């Protein structure tokens, strides 16, 4: 798709994060399998569920925009995943590996925070006010759905930082 307008750029950004979220959802179970810290594993398990919900929200955003949910290859996401897998695969010590897993997970979170923040800013600038029925919650604008995902990503980043600072990095050192 040729990007000729800001709206085209917005759609491309949605497709980019859609692809990235789906790739990250495939990567989280691998990280869980290689992690040894129980709190880290449980945190990834909970975030995998959040990631699946974020993908569902993106499906709803696409539908509200009259688009078929689809991704475009996101080289940044693939690069983060490849680098993480290579790094984690080179580490035998479980504590050091956990520290690398946290750092890799935070690289993913920071990418997602960037993408969702950008998409929200673009949607606001474009005046995108489309709504999605959320059942008992009522209707939410697509900006609200993107904000929910952004808030979850920021929360996951805070949790990873706290776990790294309080336990994982100390054990690795």
Regions inferred by a protein language model and the residue ranges of each:
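Amphipathic alpha-helical hairpins
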Residues: 1-173
């Amino acid at each position: 798709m040729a990007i000729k307008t800001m709206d085209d750029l917005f759609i491309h950004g949605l497709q980019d994060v859609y692809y990235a979220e789906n790739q990250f959802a495939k990567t989280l179970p691998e990280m869980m399998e290689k992690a040894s810290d129980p709190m880290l594993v449980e945190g990834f398990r909970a975030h995998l569920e959040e990631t699946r919900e974020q993908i569902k929200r993106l499906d709803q955003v696409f539908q509200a925009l009259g688009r078929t949910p689809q991704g475009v290859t996101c080289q940044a996401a693939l690069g983060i995943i490849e680098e993480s897998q290579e790094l984690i695969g080179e580490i035998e010590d479980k504590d050091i590996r956990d520290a690398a897993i946290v750092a890799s997970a935070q690289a993913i979170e920071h990418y997602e925070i960037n993408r969702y923040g950008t998409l929200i800013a673009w949607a606001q600038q474009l005046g995108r006010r489309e709504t999605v029925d959320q059942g008992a919650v009522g209707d939410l604008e697509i900006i609200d759905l993107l904000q929910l995902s952004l808030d979850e990503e920021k929360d996951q980043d805070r949790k990873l930082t706290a776990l790294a600072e309080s336990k994982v990095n100390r054990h690795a050192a």
